């Protein structure tokens, strides 16, 4: 078991989540701005 390997894998998962969530967050922010 390698803590650094695990950390790296977790970091990649977080980065993937941010990348996939980015457009959704932008869309929500835009919708909120339009709704005001």
UniProtKB/Swiss-Prot annotation:
Its main location: secreted. GO terms for cellular component: extracellular region. It holds the Pfam family Cecropin. Coiled coil: none annotated. The modification Lysine amide is found at residue 36. It is found in: Secreted. InterPro entries: Cecropin (IPR000875). Keywords: Amidation, Antibiotic, Antimicrobial, Immunity, Innate immunity, Secreted. PROSITE patterns: CECROPIN (PS00268). GO terms for biological process: antibacterial humoral response; defense response to Gram-positive bacterium; innate immune response. The keyword Kinase does not apply. Cecropins have lytic and antibacterial activity against several Gram-positive and Gram-negative bacteria. Belongs to the cecropin family. This is Cecropin-D.
